[in-house]
Curated annotation (Swiss-Prot):
HAMAP family, per database record: 16SrRNA_methyltr_A
Residues noted as binding S-adenosyl-L-methionine in the record, renumbered to the chain: 26, 28, 53, 74, 94, 114
Protein's name in the database: Ribosomal RNA small subunit methyltransferase A
Localization in the cell: Cytoplasm
Reactions this protein catalyses: adenosine(1518)/adenosine(1519) in 16S rRNA + 4 S-adenosyl-L-methionine = N(6)-dimethyladenosine(1518)/N(6)-dimethyladenosine(1519) in 16S rRNA + 4 S-adenosyl-L-homocysteine + 4 H(+)
Amino acid sequence: MSYSRERLQRAQEAMGIAAKKSLGQNFLVSDTVINRIIDQVKAFAPEELVEVGPGPGALTDLLLELNLPLQLIELDSAIAAYWREKGLTVIEQDALRLDWKQFYTGKRVVFVSNLPYQISSSIVIERSLENEGVAAMVLMFQKEVAQKIRGTVDSDLYGLLSVYAQAFWKIETVTDAGPRDFQPPPKVASRVLSFERIESEVKNRKAFLTFVKCAFAQRRKLLKKNLSGLLSQKKLTEEQMVGWLAELGFKETARAEELSPKQFVALYKHFGFE
């Protein structure tokens, strides 16, 4: 039995809990995967740490060894109580409804999590909406979601999540994790990604999100058709749009999946949302 499986067994006995399907709990038990996550966290040189969903502590115990301020966000009341008894600060709240500004004090904050799969895409969007926020993230995803986040131009997986995440982060694959690396085993493969904040020309990130959503609203439609509503809203013409596409090297028949994140930003800037 791996050290992580032994630790999970001890922690579950101490907490008197089992994984809750309703909360998307699949506890990580692979020493190899855990160590790769921790190594990536250390590579980002954090000054403070935030972990969502610590569970029985597969990552938490090793994060504590870094001797850095650590904030835990845990929705499961039994698990939250367990970590409070150990003297840690635990915010017992939904990570998607939390005001994350409380974590941003000018220090280099790194966010790490074996994310519940049902909130993973939303978490990435929420952190990407922030002009100032966490410096880096190391997060576990369902493999297909991870592939969408790192999706490339003209691929089936390239879409809203790809463009929006890549516009604000340098994203790399850290490691893969199979069903056997979790207890209970999920039905899907998983992948860990690292995110490092990059400079962006986009100031109004909410408007950019709306822009990209409209662009991918109907994949088979031409980009100029998907953005026709925004053109009207901004009192712009389709002819202007065709000209901007030409500047980027595209014909008027271009579709959203043909533009890179940088090209999306360049096109967006013509719409006057900033």
